[in-house]
Amino acid sequence: MALACCLLAVIARPASAASVQLRETGSTLLLPLFNLWIPDYLASNPNVTITTAATGSGAGIEAAISGTAQIGASDAYMSDEQAEQNTQIVNIPLAIAAQTVNYNLPRNGGTPLKLDGPAIAGIYSGKIREWDAEPIKALNPGVTLPHHEIILIRRADASGDTFVFTQFLDFSTPSWDDKIGYGTSVAWPSVPGEKTAVGNAGMLKAVAETPYSIGYIGISFADEAAKAHLGTAMIKNQSGRFLLPTPETMSAAASELDSRTPPDERLSLAFAPGDNSYPLINYEYAVVSTRQPDPAVAKALRDFLLWANSPLGGNTPKYLNAVHFVPLPDFIRASSEQQIQKIE
């Protein structure tokens, strides 16, 4: 009788929910935010496992398309060609980020250099070779600049940071638009002495270890850039003002363009108009397939993204301030929620 009772107790005990695994891969700029989100989310959702990988935005988009990851994290939205060929894939903004232009100038002092699109394009096309070249001097009157070769550093991987950086150059500099354009990968001009790096961590390391270098780095690495004593350039916007990325200048830039966001949410925020608009900002995307092969995976993916998008969940200052992102406007968050609900 006792044995029968024991067996009955075992049979009557409710089974624990099956574990569901989600895989995130892609943007190195967005990765620090996922690394803040995931432990807190999993603490309340122990039956879900989420893995992350820093592979670059281009790889993240491809992983979402191929189905090798449920979340392709990206600073770039899909191209028109990708969107036309993969109608099951949606681009879901999660936050607003920025890119910084950082440099390693020994004995430069604490005053940020001022740069504009044509000067940066000149550096990355090889037309401006020294730090004291006239186009840079003209933007920085009274600043002593070294007569030393500029060592430019760019991304080697398919990068959302490259996408936003080259969009800014494309929109602000006609000669760049005519010859190079923008994308997660572009046909970079060959410049003597140039270096390449993989990921934002790689860019930060390369600029920090290379005196007289310049590079572009995602703002989620701003604290590390400051610890490495890198300078951050003030960038000239459409109104002719030189600005650093702050919550105010990033939000101002987003407010100039976010009303143009289409239903599929693919929109560039680079080089926005407005006196107080920092010109190198972007939506941070989760690129996701709406057609998941397993209903349990689809539900876990929906639930996580709804939490990440919520002002009561992941879209709060606790998380966003730590990586120097700004939250989505309410109407963009509502549009993102509509896209998330399509996942099945």
Locate predicted features.
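Bacterial N-terminal signal peptides
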Residues: 1-10
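Flexible loop/hinge segments at secondary-structure junctions
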Residues: 17-344
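Sec/Tat signal peptide C-region and signal peptidase I cleavage site
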Residues: 11-17
